Amino acid sequence: MSIIDNRKASHDYFIEDRYEAGLVLQGWEVKSIRAGRVQLKESYVIVRDGELFLLGMHVSPLPTASTHIHPDAMRTRKLLLKAEEIHKLIGKVEQRGFTLVPLNLHYKNGRVKLDFALGRGKKLYDKRDTSREKDWLRERERVMKHDTRRRSD
């Protein structure tokens, strides 16, 4: 079950490979995520010292958060992956044009997981081509549906 999707990711990037990782979260963050108070829109994954980190994910603290903890909504969160996967990703990210893009947050066995992808940035004309193709597919489906109805009558 998906908690939140980053719909902008498929618009801005060509998605190559998908990966799933665990997140190192604090207790108040888990409660806020379960309440749906999270945004992935401007977030991205970086490589630092041979580890992967998620930056820019905004988790709004609940008003009932503890008074002795000062929540930081935009803190850097570590991603949990096997060492072999991390080394493979580091090799691919160092290639020109590749980046790691968060796709969605979801639950797996009661734990919060992050789906992210190895993506290549789209240029403006690529975005236009994708949009044009989607419009054409939508129009084709509409015409075929209309034509099918006419034949059955």
UniProtKB/Swiss-Prot annotation:
Key words, A-Z: Cytoplasm, RNA-binding
Gene3D superfamilies assigned to the protein according to its UniProt record, in alphabetical order: 2.40.280.10
Region: Disordered, residue numbers: 132-153
Recorded GO CC terms: cytosol
Subcellular locations according to the entry: Cytoplasm
Pfam family, one: SmpB
GO molecular function, one term: RNA binding
Domain of life: Bacteria
Principal location listed in the UniProt entry: cytoplasm
Protein's GO biological process: trans-translation
Keyword Cytoplasm in record: yes
SUPFAM superfamilies, alphabetized: Small protein B (SmpB)
HAMAP family linked: SmpB
Similarity comment: Belongs to the SmpB family.
Function: Required for rescue of stalled ribosomes mediated by trans-translation. Binds to transfer-messenger RNA (tmRNA), required for stable association of tmRNA with ribosomes. tmRNA and SmpB together mimic tRNA shape, replacing the anticodon stem-loop with SmpB. tmRNA is encoded by the ssrA gene; the 2 termini fold to resemble tRNA(Ala) and it encodes a 'tag peptide', a short internal open reading frame. During trans-translation Ala-aminoacylated tmRNA acts like a tRNA, entering the A-site of stalled ribosomes, displacing the stalled mRNA.
Protein name: SsrA-binding protein
Source species of the chain: Bordetella avium (strain 197N)
Protein's gene: smpB
